[in-house]
C-alpha cells in the first residue's frame, strides 16, 4: 500500500536530529532509545544488510554499533560513553586523527566566511590547494581536478587518460587482480572483485586484469596488445592493495611498471586514495621507489577526517586535453571552500608534525608486535604484514577474522576486515596514535588471541 508524504513527520525527524546534534551527552534512557531508533531506521530506510555486516561490533547486545562522537585524536566514543582505540581509521580517512583542532579550526573559520563558492567566480582556496599539491607531489604532476571521493578521483583519472590516449589510437586499460578502485561504473571496471562486478555486468569495455606484483604478466599484456593492435592506454594500480588485504608487491615492481609504460607509451595512474597522505611512512607510497606517475588519485585522508575531498593530479601534458574546454569534466561540490580549507590544514599538520616519519616508526613497532603474535598463535594467524601504519593480520579463515574483530571490540579496540578479503583484518589507525596506545593495542591483540585459543582448545 502506498503511503502519503508527511511533512509533519519529516519536520519531526529534522527537529529530533537537530536536538541530538546539540547534545554532548545522553541519559541512559535516551541512549537506549537512540540505539533502537538507529537500528530500526537502518533496517527500514538505509539498508538492512549493513546490520549483518556489523556483527563483530554488536556482540553481547551492548549497542556498540552506534557511535556518538570522537573521544580524542585517536579514539571514538559510543552512545554508552565507552571509549575505543580507533585502529580502523574510517578505512584511512583519519590520518591526522579525529577532529584535529587545526583542521576543525580552518573549516570553522572558512564556514564563518563562505561555505560554498558561487561556481562562477574564481575561488582562492582551490587555487592555493592546487599549487600546494603541485609542490607536494612527485615528478611533473602539476594540475589538479577536485572532487568528493576516491571513486570520483579514479573516474576523473580514467576519463583524463581516455581523452589523452584516444587520439593516439590507444583505448585499453590494464588493472590488477585484487584491485579496488571504487564502485561507480568506470572505477568498478578496474576493480577486480567479482562480488561487486557481477550484478552490474557488462561493465565498461577495454579493461584487462593481470596478476598484481607479477611484472612478467604485465609485460605480456603490453606485448600482446602491441601485436594485436589493441594498444594499452594506461595502467591503473595501487602501490599497496588496501581492500585486497594489504598486499605489498615485490620491491621494484612499481619501477618496472613505470619502465613498461614509458616503453609502450602508456600512462601510469597510481591510486593512492588509501596509501597517500603519509599512511605508509612517506607522503605518497610511490616515493618508496621514487616512481613518478602521470596521474595520481587522492581522497580519504586528504580532508583530514573532517570534510570529504578527492583530487586527481596530472602532468601538464596529460591535463592539457581539458584546457580548451574545462567543462568536459566537472562536479558541483568539487574543490569547495570548506573541503579545500580542510585539505590545506591537513597537509599543514602532516608536514609540521612530520607524521609520515611517525607512521614509519610506529608502524614498525606495531608490525613487529603483530608478527610476534603470529608466531605465537600459528593455528589462528596465517600472516602479519604492512608498511607504515597500513597493516593487516591474516587469519586462517573468515570466521576466525570475525572472531578477532569481535574480541578486539570487547577489548575496546576497533578493527575490521577488508572489502576484498574477509579473513584479513586491517590495522589502519590515525598516524597520531601514541606509543602508549600502540602498546595497548598489542596487549589487547594478545588478550584477544589468547581468548580465541582457549575457545578453540575447549572445542
Curated annotation (Swiss-Prot):
InterPro entries: Aminotrans_3, Aminotrans_3_PPA_site, Class-III_PLP-dep_AT, Putrescine_aminotransferase, PyrdxlP-dep_Trfase, PyrdxlP-dep_Trfase_major, PyrdxlP-dep_Trfase_small. Keywords: Aminotransferase, Pyridoxal phosphate, Transferase. It is an enzyme of class 2 (transferase). It holds the Pfam family Aminotran_3. GO terms for biological process: L-lysine catabolic process; putrescine catabolic process. Pathway: Amine and polyamine degradation; putrescine degradation; 4-aminobutanal from putrescine (transaminase route): step 1/1. CDD domains: OAT_like. Pyridoxal 5'-phosphate binds at residues 150-151, 274, 332. It catalyses: an alkane-alpha,omega-diamine + 2-oxoglutarate = an omega-aminoaldehyde + L-glutamate; putrescine + 2-oxoglutarate = 1-pyrroline + L-glutamate + H2O; cadaverine + 2-oxoglutarate = 5-aminopentanal + L-glutamate. One of its GO terms (molecular function) is identical protein binding. The modification N6-(pyridoxal phosphate)lysine is found at residue 300. Its cofactor is pyridoxal 5'-phosphate. Its EC number is 2.6.1.82, 2.6.1.29. It comes from the Bacteria. PROSITE patterns: AA_TRANSFER_CLASS_3. PANTHER family: AMINOTRANSFERASE CLASS III, PUTRESCINE AMINOTRANSFERASE. Catalyzes the aminotransferase reaction from putrescine to 2-oxoglutarate, leading to glutamate and 4-aminobutanal, which spontaneously cyclizes to form 1-pyrroline. This is the first step in one of two pathways for putrescine degradation, where putrescine is converted into 4-aminobutanoate (gamma-aminobutyrate or GABA) via 4-aminobutanal. Also functions as a cadaverine transaminase in a a L-lysine degradation pathway to succinate that proceeds via cadaverine, glutarate and L-2-hydroxyglutarate. Belongs to the class-III pyridoxal-phosphate-dependent aminotransferase family. Putrescine aminotransferase subfamily. NCBIfam families: PRK11522.1 (NF008570), putres_am_tran (TIGR03372). This is Putrescine aminotransferase.
Amino acid at each position: 500500500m502506498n503511503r502519503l508524504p508527511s511533512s509533519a513527520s519529516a519536520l519531526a525527524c529534522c527537529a529530533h536530529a537537530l536536538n541530538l546534534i546539540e547534545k554532548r551527552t545522553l541519559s541512559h534512557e535516551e541512549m537506549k532509545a537512540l540505539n533502537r531508533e538507529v537500528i530500526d531506521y537502518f533496517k527500514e530506510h538505509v539498508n538492512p544488510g549493513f546490520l549483518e555486516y556489523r556483527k563483530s561490533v554488536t556482540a553481547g547486545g551492548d549497542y556498540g554499533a552506534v557511535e556518538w562522537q570522537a573521544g580524542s585524536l585517536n579514539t571514538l566514543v559510543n552512545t554508552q560513553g565507552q571509549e575505543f582505540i580507533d585502529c580502523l581509521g574510517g578505512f584511512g580517512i583519519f590520518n591526522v586523527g579525529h577532529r584535529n583542532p587545526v583542521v576543525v579550526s580552518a573549516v570553522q573559520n572558512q564556514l564563518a566566511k563562505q561555505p560554498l563558492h558561487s561556481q562562477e567566480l574564481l575561488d582562492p582556496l582551490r587555487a592555493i590547494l592546487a599549487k600546494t599539491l603541485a609542490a607536494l607531489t612527485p615528478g611533473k604532476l602539476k594540475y589538479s581536478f577536485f572532487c568528493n571521493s576516491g571513486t570520483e578521483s579514479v573516474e576523473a583519472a580514467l576519463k583524463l587518460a581516455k581523452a589523452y590516449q584516444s587520439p593516439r589510437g590507444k583505448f585499453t586499460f590494464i588493472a590488477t587482480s585484487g584491485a579496488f578502485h571504487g564502485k561507480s561504473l568506470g572505477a568498478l571496471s578496474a576493480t577486480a572483485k567479482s562480488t561487486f562486478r557481477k550484478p552490474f555486468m557488462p561493465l565498461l569495455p577495454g579493461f584487462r586484469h593481470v596478476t598484481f606484483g607479477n611484472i612478467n604478466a604485465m609485460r605480456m599484456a603490453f606485448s600482446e596488445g602491441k601485436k594485436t593492435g589493441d594498444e594499452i592506454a594506461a595502467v591503473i594500480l595501487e602501490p599497496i592493495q588496501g581492500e585486497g588485504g594489504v598486499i605489498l608487491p615485490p620491491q621494484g615492481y612499481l619501477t618496472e611498471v613505470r619502465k613498461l609504460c614509458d616503453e609502450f607509451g602508456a600512462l601510469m595512474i597510481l591510486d593512492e586514495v588509501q596509501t597517500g597522505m603519509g599512511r605508509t611512512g612517506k607522503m605518497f607510497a610511490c616515493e618508496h621507489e621514487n616512481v613518478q606517475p602521470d596521474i595520481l588519485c587522492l581522497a580519504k585522508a586528504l580532508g583530514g577526517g573532517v570534510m570529504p575531498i578527492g583530487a586527481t593530479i596530472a602532468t601538464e601534458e596529460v591535463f592539457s586535453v581539458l584546457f580548451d574546454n574545462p567543462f568536459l569534466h566537472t562536479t558541483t561540490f568539487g574543490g569547495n571552500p570548506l573541503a579545500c580549507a580542510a585539505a590545506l590544514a591537513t597537509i599543514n599538520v602532516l608536514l609540521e608534525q612530520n607524521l609520515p616519519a611517525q607512521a614509519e616508526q610506529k608502524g614498525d613497532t606495531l608490525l613487529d608486535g603483530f608478527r610476534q603474535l603470529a608466531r605465537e598463535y600459528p593455528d589462528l594467524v596465517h600472516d602479519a604484514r604492512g608498511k607504515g601504519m597500513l597493516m593487516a593480520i591474516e587469519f586462517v579463515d573468515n570466521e576466525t577474522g570475525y572472531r578477532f574483530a569481535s574480541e578486539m571490540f570487547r577489548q575496546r579496540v576497533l578493527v575490521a576486515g577488508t572489502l576484498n578479503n574477509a579473513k584479513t583484518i586491517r590495522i589502519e589507525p590515525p598516524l597520531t596514535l601514541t606509543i602508549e596506545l600502540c602498546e595497548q593495542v598489542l596487549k589487547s591483540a594478545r588478550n584477544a588471541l589468547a581468548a580465541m585459543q582457549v575457545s578453540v582448545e575447549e572445542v
